[in-house]
Curated annotation (Swiss-Prot):
Residues 137-161, 174-190, 325-335, 385-395, 445-455, 487-498, 506-529 have a biased composition (Polar residues). Residues 1-23 form the signal peptide. Residues 50-59, 293-305, 336-345, 396-405, 456-465, 530-546 have a biased composition (Basic and acidic residues). Its main location: secreted. InterPro entries: Semenogelin. Belongs to the semenogelin family. PANTHER family: SEMENOGELIN-2, SEMENOGELIN/SEMINAL VESICLE SECRETORY PROTEIN. Residues 25-62, 91-190, 272-553 are annotated as: Disordered. It comes from Macaca fascicularis. This is Semenogelin-2.
């Protein structure tokens, strides 16, 4: 026992002397060995570790060189060999410091031979401290894309927080951002690459779209903000539309500052819309924007903000949804654009509101809607199939503009009926509407009819205000949980709209009232009388509720009918509709 104690004490003295020598040379390096030399009297076999944690802040950020070796407490020769090994490792580390600048120069070259040179003789183990806990060698080559897209490097340095920790401080900023982008692409983990790489996942074509996107530096900042808000939605919807997007170029990626991304799924629609280029740039802008709103239909719970709709385009859109398939057709009659742009200002807006029908839980804000178009919209829903047809008769638009101002308003409000949970705010809508709407529900379904003769316009505007309020409240009936706020709506236009719901089938038909109604004031009086004839065909219950509406008791006319045969109803309604349209 005494011999063992003496042996341990002698070993401790030897180690303390060596620790003093090491402390003079390497500072705090000897503390590890001296601190670990106090324990061999407790255990026969010990594990000694000498770590070198000196950080090269001037060249390599934060990395540590670790040397680990095992020492047997009973073997003096092995202890001496391990200490000699530690001294050799320290000498190699000093050599590696001398070659750091040469190593950085090797990183700058993009040649295959020099780019991948790793001076393994100088480093035993390099540990880069990061959150992921992964070990990376500092001799990695930067990405091959270095120098191709400098603006992309700036984005990668802005959006990646972990790349800031991986930067080599001795390198320049461009090299640091390139190395950070390369590590983020190859290793993944908790890295967050720049926005264009995460959203536009196109194989082998990311560089071209990145360069194309940076050409539009004027629109880039706003589009990045929009993408940051809708990143979860855009990633799911961008993937099936990459082929069409690459064909059209960067114009389909960045359209306007306030709009989201446009996915050109309908190439034929864009071709048809380009026919209006001969009439001016305004018409083309409006038609292109209508296609962007039409392509937004699969996005549920979307927040769409439309301000300052561009002027001068007629957009007739037809949606046929058969067994979950959507077919969009656009026909643009430009023969009546010579009468002026006032007739054509808001037809786009009505079509965009029509496309919002299938968007459940949508919040649509429409402000500053321009004046003057006739929008007759037809919805036929047969066995869960939705068919939307829009026909714009512009042959009588030259007779006046007041009649054409707000027919959009009634149609757009009617189109909101199927939007459950929608919040629609419409402000500053142009003036004038008599909304004659007929809804017939058969087999336990309500039937609503509102007929307002236009002869009341010459008596005053009070009757017309009540008429519009009744139609707007009628349109709120099918809005489950919908909140619609309509402000500053005034008078004077005719819009005949008919909705039929037959055995779960929804049909909205709107005849053309424009053939002979606006030739003069007498024609308006006759149309009002014809509307009175149609009103006389209603039941006593209809007339009673219609009178209650004007008395202020009710703002909505609800009439319930049960008809046995659908063909009979269609024939009777067509006969009743003929006096109004002629």
């Amino acid at each position: 026992m005494k011999s063992i104690i003496l042996f341990v004490l002698s070993l401790l003295l030897i180690l303390e002397k060596q620790a003093a020598v090491m402390g003079q040379k390497g500072g705090s390096k000897g503390q590890l060995s001296s601190g670990s030399s106090r324990f061999p009297h407790r255990h026969r076999s010990q594990h000694y570790s000498g770590q070198k944690d000196k950080q090269h802040t001037e060249s390599k950020g934060s990395f540590s060189i670790q040397h680990t070796y095992h020492v047997d407490a009973n073997d003096h020769d092995r202890t001496r060999k391990s200490q000699q090994y530690y001294l050799n490792a320290q000498h190699k580390t000093t050599k590696s410091k001398q070659h750091l600048r040469r190593h950085q120069r090797l990183l700058n070259y993009k040649q295959k031979g020099r780019g991948r040179v790793k001076p393994k003789r100088h480093f035993h183990l390099i540990v880069i401290h990061r959150k992921g806990g992964q070990v990376h060698h500092g001799t990695q080559n930067p990405s091959q894309d270095q120098g191709n897209s400098p603006s992309g490097k700036g984005i990668s340095s802005q959006y990646s927080n972990t790349e800031e920790r991986l930067r080599v401080r001795g390198l320049s900023k461009e090299q640091a951002s390139a190395s950070g982008a390369q590590k983020g692409r190859t290793q993944g983990g908790s890295q967050t690459n720049y926005v264009l790489q995460t959203e536009e996942l196109v194989a082998n074509k990311q560089q071209r779209e990145t360069q194309n996107s940076h050409r539009n530096k004027g629109h880039y900042q706003n589009v990045v903000d929009v993408r940051x808000e809708h990143s979860s939605k855009l990633q799911t919807s961008l993937r099936p539309a990459h082929q069409h997007k690459l064909q059209h170029g960067y114009k389909d990626i960045f359209t306007t500052q306030d709009e989201l991304l446009v996915y050109n799924k309908n190439q034929h629609q864009t071709k048809n819309l380009n026919q209006d280029q001969e009439h001016g740039r305004k018409a083309h802008k409006g038609s292109y924007q209508s296609s962007s709103t039409e392509e937004r239909q699969p996005n549920h719970e979307e927040k769409s903000v439309q301000k300052g709709v561009p002027k001068g385009s007629i957009s007739i859109q037809t949606e046929e949804k058969i067994y979950g398939k959507s077919q969009n057709q656009v026909t643009i009659p430009s023969q009546d654009q010579e009468h002026g742009h006032k007739e054509n200002k808001i037809s786009y807006q009505s079509s965009s509101a029509e496309e919002r029908r299938l968007n459940s839980g949508e919040k649509g804000i429409q402000k500053g809607v321009s004046k003057g178009s006739i929008s007759i919209q037809t919805e036929e829903k047969i066995h869960g199939k939705s068919q939307n047809q829009v026909a714009i008769p512009s042959q009588d638009q030259e007779h006046g503009h007041k009649e054409n101002k707000i027919s959009y308003q009634s149609s757009s409000a009617e189109e909101r009926q199927l939007n459950s949970g929608e919040k629609g705010i419409q402000k500053g809508v142009s003036k004038g509407s008599i909304s004659i709407q007929t809804e017939e529900k058969i087999y336990g379904k309500s039937q609503n009819q509102v007929t307002i003769p236009s002869q009341d316009q010459e008596h005053g505007h009070k009757e017309n205000k009540i008429a519009y309020q009744s139609s707007s409240t009628e349109e709120r009936q099918l809005n489950y949980g919908g909140k619609s706020i309509q402000k500053d709506v005034s008078q004077s236009s005719l819009s005949f709209q008919t909705e039929k719901l037959v055995e779960g089938k929804s049909q909205i038909q709107t005849p053309n009232p424009n053939q002979g109604q606006w030739s003069g004031q007498n024609a308006k009086g006759n149309s009002g009388k014809s509307a009175d004839r149609k009103q006389d065909l209603l039941s006593h219950e209809q007339e009673g509720r219609y009178q209650q509406e004007f008395s202020g008791a009710h703002n909505t006319v609800n009439i319930e009918h049960k008809v046995a045969y659908d063909d009979l109803l269609t024939q009777q309604y067509n006969e009743d509709r003929n006096p109004i349209s002629t």
